[in-house]
């Protein structure tokens, strides 16, 4: 009996020891397994994140953007802005297709083209000149729109403010240094007493510049008289009326006048009336001189904005309207016109 009890006691003690060892083994295994599991989960998460980032980068690199362009009319300044935009996109190295549309100065065509570009589902639309910008901005609040060759987007009702656009429209302004242009006028033509301001009354950008010009002309001690047109058919008759009343004509960056500048120059130069212009393209078409911006560079500036917006690095709402500085403006003179008028521009040559 005693032997039996002793054997049972030994057996129980052995089982207790084995149970204790088993518990310790499980604890060690648990302690060893838990960190390993956490590390595996972390590694898996890092791998998934890396794959996601690589996929996103690949998608961005391979994406082909769809861009629509609406240009109001063909003339040197707007053509240069358009080319600068395209060259800027090419320099950025992005893949894109572009649908180029020109309204040929027709507001009805502007509206039709604007609707087409919106309905085509473009990733971004470039609008060149104020009427074109207003047309497309009225068709969508979703597609990013960049404008260029627009003098004052805020006054034109395109943005909440030029500093903080606040919507789907931003871009660049072609506000020229009107003050410096009037100063150039008085320097080249010190005997002038009356300045004729020639522009299209339907263009907000021209009205804005004309108001600045009036103040600067008055500050220079000169008189001014307005000569406005509402269609290209009126240009010749209006200029013919102006040349008998003024000593010089000032034409701001007005799209209708720019497109009809050869007619303006023909009438003015025949009557020995100099034309100081808002931009270099108008000078090339027969105007006397200007101190203005480079529209090609303005287009490239707009392209830089476009690339950031397309890549998701910026939004139109938070992209301020861009401007070229006065230091980036240059003198442009037409030697042939100067010779016709008997004016020496050699002092302004580079």
What are these regions (language model features)?
Residues 102-160, 254-269, 273, 277-278:
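Beta-alpha junction/loop-to-helix N-cap segments that form part of ligand/metal-binding clefts
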Residues 280-333:
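Flexible loop/turn connectors
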Residues 61-62, 153-194, 294-314:
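Hydrophobic alpha-helical segments within soluble ligand-binding/sensing domains
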């Amino acid at each position: 009996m005693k032997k039996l009890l002793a054997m049972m006691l030994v057996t129980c003690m052995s089982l207790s020891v084995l149970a204790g060892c088993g518990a310790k083994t499980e604890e060690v295994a648990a302690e060893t397994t838990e960190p390993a599991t956490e590390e595996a989960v972390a590694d898996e998460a890092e791998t998934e994140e890396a794959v996601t980032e690589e996929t996103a980068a690949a998608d961005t690199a391979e994406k082909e953007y769809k861009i629509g362009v609406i240009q109001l009319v063909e003339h040197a300044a707007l053509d240069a802005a358009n080319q600068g935009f395209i060259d800027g996109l090419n320099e950025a190295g992005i893949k894109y297709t572009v649908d180029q549309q020109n309204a040929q100065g027709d507001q009805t065509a502007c509206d039709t083209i604007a609707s087409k570009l919106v309905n085509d589902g473009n990733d971004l639309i470039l609008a060149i000149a104020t009427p074109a910008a207003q047309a497309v901005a009225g068709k969508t609040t979703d597609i990013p729109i960049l404008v260029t060759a627009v003098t004052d987007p805020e006054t034109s009702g395109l943005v909440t403010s030029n500093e903080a656009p606040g919507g789907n429209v931003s871009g660049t302004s072609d506000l020229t240094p009107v003050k410096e242009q009037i100063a150039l006028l008085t320097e080249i033509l010190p005997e002038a007493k009356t300045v004729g301001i020639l522009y299209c009354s339907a263009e907000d950008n021209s009205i804005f510049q004309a108001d600045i010009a009036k103040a600067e002309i008055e500050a220079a001690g000169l008189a001014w008289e307005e000569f406005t047109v509402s269609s290209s058919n009126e240009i010749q008759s209006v200029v013919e009326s102006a040349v008998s009343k003024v000593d010089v004509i000032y034409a701001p960056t007005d799209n209708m006048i720019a497109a009809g500048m050869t007619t303006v120059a023909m009438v003015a130069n025949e009557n020995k009336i100099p034309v100081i212009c808002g931009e270099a393209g108008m000078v090339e078409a027969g105007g006397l001189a200007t101190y203005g911006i480079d529209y090609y560079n303005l287009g490239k500036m707009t392209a830089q904005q476009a690339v950031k917006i397309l890549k998701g690095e910026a939004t139109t709402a938070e992209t301020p309207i861009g401007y070229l500085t006065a230091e980036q403006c240059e003198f442009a003179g037409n030697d042939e016109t100067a010779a016709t008028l008997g004016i020496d521009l050699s002092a302004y040559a580079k």
